[in-house]
From Swiss-Prot:
The modification Phosphoserine is found at S13, S328, S334. The active site is at D465 (4-aspartylphosphate intermediate). InterPro entries: ATP_Ca_trans_C (IPR022141), ATPase_P-typ_cation-transptr_C (IPR006068), ATPase_P-typ_cation-transptr_N (IPR004014), ATPase_P-typ_cyto_dom_N (IPR023299), ATPase_P-typ_P_site (IPR018303), ATPase_P-typ_TM_dom_sf (IPR023298), ATPase_P-typ_transduc_dom_A_sf (IPR008250), HAD-like_sf (IPR036412). GO terms for molecular function: ATP binding; ATP hydrolysis activity; calmodulin binding; metal ion binding; nitric-oxide synthase binding; nitric-oxide synthase inhibitor activity; P-type calcium transporter activity; protein phosphatase 2B binding. Residues 1-100, 169-368, 430-843, 893-918, 978-994, 1050-1207 are cytoplasmic. It comes from Bos taurus. Residues 1104-1113 are annotated as: Calmodulin-binding subdomain B. SMART domains: Cation_ATPase_N. This is Plasma membrane calcium-transporting ATPase 4. SUPFAM superfamilies: Calcium ATPase, transduction domain A, Calcium ATPase, transmembrane domain M, HAD-like, Metal cation-transporting ATPase, ATP-binding domain N. Residues 1163-1181 have a biased composition (Polar residues). Its main location: membrane. Calcium/calmodulin-regulated and magnesium-dependent enzyme that catalyzes the hydrolysis of ATP coupled with the transport of calcium out of the cell. By regulating sperm cells calcium homeostasis, may play a role in sperm motility.
Length: 1207
């Protein structure tokens, strides 16, 4: 992979020479795509002779698309480039090694080891050795003297091993992250027409000249020019900063830009620029160049002694984000907030990360104090013994020997600190998450943000969509009401009047997205494939069941002949299509939610096909006798209607007038069966202490019936099922503002929210998260598929997007993508999340036992024997076992069903429970008893020479080798004990299902044998006899037996035990900190590319002078930028949005007639001024969506405004 800065565009001469091949060059198309509105239309018409002629120049057919000839596609890639923006160059292994070497404790060890190494070669002058006291208390032979350098060299070697292991782990982690990113990118496909067929193509395979089909919810992968569009609206805020949606049409503005979102409508475009030649790619290229320039400046600044800019906030991975104020006043406010934030403790988005950070700091402080006391005691004892008790003078020639002792003491202290500081915790978290993410892919969970995996383990509530998640999303019409008759099964075509049959067929075939269709089954005897919107597919299937052909209708009325299309959105809750009648005038077909469309009908077709009046009492009767019975059977009801316009040109922009006086053709009942595995999955959630709520756009009766089938509600339960309108009435005050107190009375009992908009979903999620009801804050997971589900997905602790039915916008806002759109996969995510939490707790139980024992042994040994029984290199080896191998073994335990039989841990539950504390202290007591017995009585028990008070460079003793070997073997068997943290007795349960664990334990044991038998002086070891090995092994196995003893002690009786590793409590959060956004450093680490994007988009205001096309007016505006976010919102990542503090008033779900009046008035914007609410479309008719987008207007003095006006 290459850095964007290394990619330069081809020179103009080369580009111009290629003009003959396609009739236009890359530069021509780039210049064309920089134009907007009338300028763009003039250029297309004057220079290219219209869009169709441009297609001819690009050798593509606007209807059939490219032929798909490999040679032609390859030529296009060579001439116009590939649709790839090169990612940031990954760090090399050597760079990661250098980063690992920056660890403070390792640096201290390196310095101490080098000093030890240098001084070991010093020999005091002969004859005066006796006066140096303790340094030469016993004579050394030549071999012992020569061995002095070995300890220093061994420490250096151990540090190198630790650094290499750390660098390798970082490298593999980054590789895995990039693999995950590549997987996500490969998942992204786009619809293009090739050789007359619509195919799904990976975004990277799109070339200039492709005819792309665009629809609601798409993220445009390349620049293009509109060929044909239906009510198309684009969100261009990612490039222009304008939050208002831009209406696209051939007459107004046909320019479509990569990185923008389709918020409404559909259409076709010809691709004109891809990759680094697209508008997004150009900005990326500029950012790469500006980054290179800045780095050069930084280097020069350092050489010349220029201080770096202080207005930079360092992120975790060292990327500096340049902060610029939005305007003068906001700049002051943001500066004050920044200062406050700098003083306050940061809250972690990930519950686990927050707890681990706090615990690591506590342990680190304790370790630092213990190591300092250890060094102090060793030095004081040495000084007092030599210079006070024995009254020896300080001789100059003895100074190097004394220094050697001080260095040795210092090394002991540092090794105590190294063992005490739990560096293995981040590694254990990374390994556990990476392992879980990899396995979750097999369970149809594509994790985009690593912390979401762990957060799911704490989930207490799931707000789920109905269609496709709880149901099969395999819709079919099973009942109908046509001509005053209710059919409980599909009627025969002979039963219907020809006129009515034709109206049904035309009303469905024409008034459905042409991308929705029924294809033959993939396997013989299988069900026909439904492509596109599943609701529309159900209606098309209804046409086929009536023995009619919708293809024939669409051939007669191709998409180009559609006069006007009102696409489905959350305000209309319907879709309407207008066509010209052969004899003059227009006909409009409408379809939508039955209660919405029927309210706009004033006539209905009777048995003879004649239109008869349809009054309010008739509508109420139909609702009572037709719609409600269908809904109670779990069917969704849709109404199909039409209207003829015979006189003149109607006011098409006045929807309130157009969408009235309809004639009802039919009402159909659509069945979407509940997935067979869902009831069991919801039962598991209930057992696991997770409340499942259904949030749907369906009728309240339909929603209640489906919820009952799923097991979300059971008859007789005291739970609420509300419609969005009633929900808003209950939670809002007279001003329309949400009151948390009112919401707190509703949400605990709410199980079904029907006829809801995405605003309602966001309000519910926010209300549950912000609620203070109960001891713990709720952890909420949300599913979403529509563009307008973005705010709710972002607000939730974990957002699940649908991989099949979900839009690109929803996927971008999500944390996890369900590749099978199945609720059962969410339950598996819960299981994996809890498993991560348990894996970290297992590792903690193991590591803290080692910490406690190693620190106490080193400290006590130093105080009593002036030496640590465990040498520096041995402790580094133990630390390596702890940090790497144990984390690998314990963090990769597979999950079990028992995880779902426990309640959620909660945000404030400690990482170290009382049971774990009992295990840690219990095993520490056993190990300390054994080690102290061996230290002070081991030589007598084994009948060997004592290793205590040995001279500085004396050879390794069997005594201390036995202590070291016993210590390691006890840790090894305690690793098996640590597999269980909830008091289970059978620690071997499922051990052979985890091959990694078995391999690590076996590998560590073999390594220990090699170290003891062949490690020699570097490891301060000597060979042991067979009987000594058996004793060591017996003591190690005693850990397993002792574990059973500890398990018999009831935890409740040990009330003196305290818990540790709590989350941040409410009392600990200051008032100033309450408003701060939660920051997830793991996410920032994962998505360095997006951080680069954000940084560059802000910095481009000062770097953009390199672009020659900008006029001089731009240079003035750059000096005083007033708009921070002019073009920053490319992928709308949550960590980059700036949440406004003011109260938000979402769109109320009022009477449809009132909404239509507001929306359809000319000049009315869909976003309110303080504006958080922009009504949008939804992919499926069953949900009702409304998007909240942040308004960041392009200021008249901003560089981007200059760019737009001057180009």
């Amino acid at each position: 992979m290459t850095n964007p800065t290394e990619h330069t565009l081809p020179s103009n001469s080369i580009l111009e020479s290629r003009e003959g091949e396609f009739g236009c060059t890359v530069m021509d198309l780039r210049k064309l795509m920089e134009l907007r509105s009338s300028d763009a239309i003039d250029q297309i018409n004057v220079h290219y002779g219209g869009v169709m002629n441009l297609c001819s120049r690009l050798k593509t057919n606007p209807v059939e698309g490219l032929s798909g000839n490999p040679a032609d596609l390859e030529k296009r890639k060579q001439v116009f480039g590939q649709n790839l923006i090169p990612p940031k160059k990954p760090k090399t292994f050597l760079e990661l090694v250098w980063e690992a070497l920056q660890d403070v404790t390792l640096i201290i060890l390196e310095i101490a080891a080098i000093i030890s190494l240098v001084l070991s070669f010093y020999r005091p002058p002969g004859g005066e050795n006796e006066q140096c006291g303790l340094a030469v208390t016993s004579p050394e032979d030549e071999g012992e003297a020569e061995a002095g350098w070995i300890e220093g060299a061994a420490i250096l070697f151990s540090v190198i091993i630790v650094v290499l292991v750390t660098a390798f782990n970082d490298w593999s982690k980054e590789k895995q992250f990039r693999g995950l990113q590549n997987r996500i990118e490969k998942e992204q496909k786009f619809s293009v027409i090739r050789n007359g067929h619509i195919i799904q193509l990976p975004v990277a395979e799109i070339v200039v000249g492709d005819i792309a089909q665009i629809k609601y919810g798409d993220l445009l992968p390349a620049d293009g020019i509109l060929i044909q569009g239906n009510d198309l609206k684009i969100d261009e805020s990612s490039l222009t900063g304008e939050s208002d949606h831009v209406k696209k049409s051939l007459e107004r503005d046909p320019m479509l830009l990569s990185g923008t979102h389709v918020m409404e409508g559909s259409g076709r475009m010809v691709v004109t620029a891809v990759g680094i030649n697209s508008q997004t790619g150009i900005i990326f290229t500029l950012l790469g160049a500006s980054e290179g320039e800045e780095e050069e400046k930084k280097k020069k600044g350092k050489k010349q002694g220029v201080p770096e800019n202080r207005n930079k906030a360092k992120t975790q991975d060292g990327v500096a984000l340049e902060i610029q104020p939005l305007n003068s006043q906001e700049g002051i406010d943001s500066e004050e907030k920044e200062k406050k934030a700098a003083k306050l403790p940061k809250k972690e988005k990930s519950v686990l990360q927050g707890k681990l950070t706090r615990l690591a700091v506590q342990i680190g402080k304790a370790g630092l104090i213990m190591s300092a006391i250890t060094v102090l005691i060793l030095i004081l004892y040495f000084v007092i013994d030599n210079f006070v008790i024995q009254r020896r003078p300080w001789l100059a020639e003895c100074t190097p020997i004394y220094v050697q002792y001080f260095v040795k003491f210092f090394i002991i202290g540092v090794t105590v600190l190294v063992v005490a500081v739990p560096e293995g915790l981040p590694l254990a978290v990374t390994i556990s998450l990476a392992y879980s993410v990899k396995k979750m892919m097999k369970d149809n969970n594509l994790v985009r943000h690593l912390d979401a995996c762990e957060t799911m383990g704490n989930a207490t509530a799931i707000c789920s969509d109905k269609t496709g998640t709880l149901t099969m999303n395999r819709m079919s019409v099973v009942q109908a009401y046509i001509g005053d008759t209710r059919y409980h099964q599909i009627p025969s075509p002979d039963d219907l009047v020809p006129k009515v049959l034709d109206l049904i067929v035309n009303g469905i075939s024409i008034n459905s997205a042409y991308t929705s269709k029924i294809l033959p089954p993939e396997k013989e005897g299988g069900l026909p494939r439904q492509v596109g919107n599943k609701t529309e597919c159900a209606l098309l299937g209804f046409v086929s069941d009536l023995k009619q052909d919708y293809h024939a209708v669409r051939s007669e009325v191709p998409e180009e002949k559609l006069y006007k299309v009102y696409t489905f959105n959350s305000v209309r809750k319907s879709m309407s299509t207008v066509i010209e009648k052969p004899g003059g005038g227009y006909r409009m077909y409408s379809k939508g939610a039955s209660e919405i469309i029927l309210r706009k009908c004033n006539r209905i077709l009777d048995k003879k096909g004649e239109a008869v009046p349809f009054k309010n009492k008739d509508r109420d009767e139909m609702v009572r006798t037709v719609i409600e019975p269908m809904a109670c059977e779990g069917l969704r009801t849709l109404c199909i209607a039409y209207r003829d316009f015979n006189d003149g040109e109607p006011p098409w922009d006045n929807e309130s007038e157009i969408l009235t006086e309809l004639t009802c053709i039919a009402v159909v009942g659509i069945e979407d069966p509940v997935r067979p595995e869902v009831p069991e999955a919801i039962a598991k959630c209930k057992r696991a202490g997770i409340t499942v709520r259904m949030v749907t756009g369906d009728n309240i009766n339909t929603a209640r019936a489906i919820a009952t089938k799923c097991g979300i509600v059971t008859p007789g339960d005291d739970f609420l099922c509300l419609e969005g309108k009633e929900f808003n009435r209950l939670i809002r005050n007279e001003k329309g503002e949400v009151e948390q107190e009112k919401l707190d009375k509703i949400w605990p009992k709410l199980r079904v929210l029907a006829r809801s908009s995405p605003t309602d979903k966001h309000t519910l999620v926010k209300g549950i998260i912000d609620s203070t009801v109960g001891d713990q804050r709720q952890v909420v997971a949300v599913t979403g598929d529509g563009t307008n589900d973005g705010p709710a997905l972002k607000k939730a602790d974990v957002g699940f997007a649908m991989g099949i039915a979900g839009t690109d916008v929803a996927k971008e806002a999500s944390d996890i993508i369900l590749t099978d759109d199945n609720f059962t996969s969410i339950v598996k995510a819960v299981m994996w999340g809890r498993n991560v939490y348990d894996s970290i707790s297992k590792f903690l139980q193991f590591q803290l036992t080692v910490n406690v024992v190693a620190v106490i042994v080193a400290f006590t040994g130093a105080c009593i024997t002036q030496d640590s029984p465990l040498k520096a290199v041995q402790m580094l080896w133990v630390n390596l076992i702890m940090d790497t191998f144990a984390s690998l073994a314990l963090a990769t335990e597979p999950p079990t069903d028992s995880l779902l039989k426990r309640r959620p841990y909660g945000r404030n539950k400690p990482l170290i429970s009382r049971t774990m504390m009992k295990n840690i202290l219990g095993h520490a007591v056993y190990q300390l008893t054994v080690i102290f017995f061996l230290v002070f009585a081991g030589e007598k028990f084994f009948d060997i020479d004592s290793g205590r008070r040995a001279p500085l460079h004396s050879p390794p003793s069997q005594h201390y080798t036995i202590i070291f070997n016993t210590f390691v073997l006890m840790q090894l068997f305690n690793e098996i004990n640590s597999r269980k943290i909830h008091g289970e007795r059978n620690v071997f349960s499922g051990i052979f299902r985890n091959l990694i664990f078995c391999s690590v334990v076996l590998g560590t044991f073999i390594s220990q044998i090699i170290i003891v038998e062949f490690g020699g002086k570097p490891f301060s070891c000597t060979k042991l006899t067979l009987s000594q090995w058996f004793w060591c092994l017996f003591i190690g196995i005693g850990e397993l037996l002792w574990g059973q003893v500890i398990s018999t002690i009831p935890t409740q009786s040990l009330k003196f035990l305290k818990e540790a590793g709590h989350g941040t409590t409410k009392e600990e959060i200051t008032k100033d900190a309450e408003g701060l956004d939660e920051i997830d450093h793991a996410e920032m680490e994962l998505r360095r590319g997006q951080i680069l994007w954000f940084r560059g988009l802000n910095r481009i205001q000062t770097q953009i002078k390199v672009v020659k096309a900008f006029h001089s007016s731009l240079h003035e505006s750059i000096q005083k930028p007033k708009n921070q976010n002019s073009i920053h919102n490319f992928m709308t990542h949550p960590e980059f949005t700036i949440d406004e503090e003011g109260p938000r008033t979402p769109l109320l779900d009022e009477q449809e007639e009132e909404i239509f009046e507001k929306v359809s008035k000319p000049g009315t914007k869909t976003s309110s001024l303080d504006g958080e609410v922009t009504p949008q479309t939804n992919k499926n008719n069953n949900t009702v969506d409304c998007c909240q987008v942040q308004i960041v207007a392009s200021h008249s003095d901003s560089p981007l405004h200059s760019l737009e006006t001057s180009v």
